[in-house]
Amino acid sequence: METEQPEETFPNTETNGEFGKRPAEDMEEEQAFKRSRNTDEMVELRILLQSKNAGAVIGKGGKNIKALRTDYNASVSVPDSSGPERILSISADIETIGEILKKIIPTLEEGLQLPSPTATSQLPLESDAVECLNYQHFKGSDFDCELRLLIHQSLAGGIIGVKGAKIKELRENTQTTIKLFQECCPHSTDRVVLIGGKPDRVVECIKIILDLISESPIKGRAQPYDPNFYDETYDYGGFTMMFDDRRGRPVGFPMRGRGGFDRMPPGRGGRPMPPSRRDYDDMSPRRGPPPPPPGRGGRGGSRARNLPLPPPPPPRGGDLMAYDRRGRPGDRYDGMVGFSADETWDSAIDTWSPSEWQMAYEPQGGSGYDYSYAGGRGSYGDLGGPIITTQVTIPKDLAGSIIGKGGQRIKQIRHESGASIKIDEPLEGSEDRIITITGTQDQIQNAQYLLQNSVKQYSGKFF
C-alpha cells in the first residue's frame, strides 16, 4: 500500500511526465509549504514594556505567565529591572508568538485593572488564569495599540529595504505605522521598532518582520539591551515620563485633530503622526558618522553625538572670525560653540540673530559639509529639509539646569522642539559636557532656544 510522503521530504526534482516541468499548482503548494515550514521554526521576540505593565503579563503569583507557557507550549519571561522599562521575551514558532501577543496586547494598552466577569466571558480564553488579559472598554480588537520591538542594529536594513521600499510595503500591506528609531538602546546594539495600529494588524506586521529577520544572520557584536541601564538622555524610542503624562496614550499616536503630518498610506483613515516627533523616520540603516571635513579631526565613534562640528556664527557686521571656547574672537578655531561657567550660556548667545543661528547649523561656502545620514544621500525630517547635527559645550555644572529632575526638562525640550538631543558625560579631566542636537534646521533652532531658556531659568538650581 502506498504511504504518504512527509512534507519534509518534498522532492525538489519532481517532474511532470516526459515534459520535465512542474505544474503551476505544485509550485504554489511548494511555496506555501516553505512559508509554513519557516513559521514552525523557533524564534525569539523581545518587546520593550513599561515596568508598571509587566504585572498584568505575569499575574498574581505568576498565574498569567504560567498559563501562557502551558497553553501555548512557549517560553515567556519578563525579567525584573530597577528602571521604568522591562523586556518581554517570547520563544516559540512565529504563529504561536502571534497568538500570545493577541492575548497580551490588550493589557499593555489598558494597564493593570481586572476586567469585569462580563467582559471576560466575551473573549475566548485558553485558560481562566489569564482572565486579566482583556481590554475593558472595547469589544473584539477595534482599538489602536502599539508595540516596541527590539532588534539587532544589523537587521535594520532588512526591514527598511532598498531606498525604504520594504518598510513602505510593510506599512501599506499591514496598514500599520512603523518607525525604526535611529539611536541604539543605552549600552546595547539593539534598536527599537515602533509598530502601531489595530491589534490584528500589528501582530501580522510583527510576524512578517520576524520572518524577515529570522533569515538574516546578525553582523558584528551583539549586546542585548539591559533595562537596568535605562538612561533618559538617550533618544532611542523607549518609554519616558511623557508617556505617563499623556495618560497612557501611545506616543506614536496623538489625539485626533488637524495639524499632524500623515504618514499613513492614503485612504486608510489612520491617525496621523505629529510633526513634532523627536525622531525622524529612518529610511536606511545608519552606517556611522560621515567623514570629517578636510583638515578637521573627527572625534570618532559611530554615534550621532560624535559627528563633526559646525562653525560658530560670525559677529554682526563683520567677517567670519575664529573664536576660542569662551566665545571670544581668537587666533584658534575650536569648531565648537562654547561657554564658560563665569559668563553662562545665555550671556554668550542672547544676542544672536536668526540668521546667525542659521549660519551655525548650515555648511558654509566651499568648505561646506553634509551633516545628514545615509552616506550623503541625506535624510529629511517631518517638517522638510535635511537632517543635520550640531554640537555645543556647556560647563558640566550647568547640565542639571537642562536635564532636570529625572530628566523631565530635557524630555520636554525634545518633545517641544522635535529634535534629538543627547548629552555626553564629561570626558576625564574635562569641565565641559557636549550636547549633540540632531534634526531639521527649524528643530535645531527651536531646541537651542529652549535649552538656552532652561539654563537661564534654572541655572544654579540643580537636582
From Swiss-Prot:
Biological process according to GO: mRNA processing; RNA splicing
**Sites bearing N6-succinyllysine, chain numbering:** K219
Task: Give the region (5 X 4 AA repeats of G-X-G-G) as residue ranges.
Answer: 59-407
Which compartment or compartments is the protein found in?
A: Cytoplasm; Nucleus, Nucleoplasm; Cell projection, Podosome
Question: Which portions of the chain have biased composition (kind: Basic and acidic residues)?
Answer: 19-37, 276-285
Residue(s) carrying Phosphoserine: S36, S75, S116, S214, S216, S284, S379, S420
Q: Where is this cross-link: Glycyl lysine isopeptide (Lys-Gly) (interchain with G-Cter in SUMO2)?
A: K34, K52, K60, K163, K219, K405, K422
Q: Which residues carry this modification: Omega-N-methylarginine?
A: R316, R377
sequence repeat coordinates: 54-76, 59-62, 245-250, 257-260, 267-270, 295-298, 324-329, 399-421, 404-407
Region (Disordered) residue spans: 1-37, 250-329
Record PTM text = Sumoylated by CBX4. Sumoylation is increased upon DNA damage, such as that produced by doxorubicin, etoposide, UV light and camptothecin, due to enhanced CBX4 phosphorylation by HIPK2 under these conditions.
Which PROSITE patterns does the UniProt record give? KH_TYPE_1 (PS50084)
Span-the-membrane segments of this chain are none
- Please list where the region (2 X 22 AA approximate repeats) is annotated: 54-421
Q: Where do we see the Glycyl lysine isopeptide (Lys-Gly) (interchain with G-Cter in SUMO1) cross-link in this protein?
A: K34, K163, K422
**Cross-linked residues, Glycyl lysine isopeptide (Lys-Gly) (interchain with G-Cter in SUMO):** K422
Q: Report one GO cellular component.
A: cytoplasm
Q: Where is this region: Interaction with ZIK1?
A: 209-337
Annotated region described as Necessary for interaction with DDX1, given as residue ranges: 1-276
Q: Which residues carry this modification: Phosphothreonine?
A: T39
Record keywords = Acetylation, Activator, Cell junction, Cell projection, Cytoplasm, DNA-binding, Glycoprotein, Isopeptide bond, Methylation, mRNA processing, mRNA splicing, Nucleus, Phosphoprotein, Repeat, Repressor, Ribonucleoprotein, RNA-binding, Spliceosome, Transcription, Transcription regulation, Ubl conjugation
Where is each KH domain found? 42-104, 144-209, 387-451
Per the record, residues carrying N6-acetyllysine are: K34, K198, K405
Q: What is this protein called?
A: Heterogeneous nuclear ribonucleoprotein K
The organism named in the record is Oryctolagus cuniculus (Rabbit)
By which gene is this protein encoded?
HNRNPK
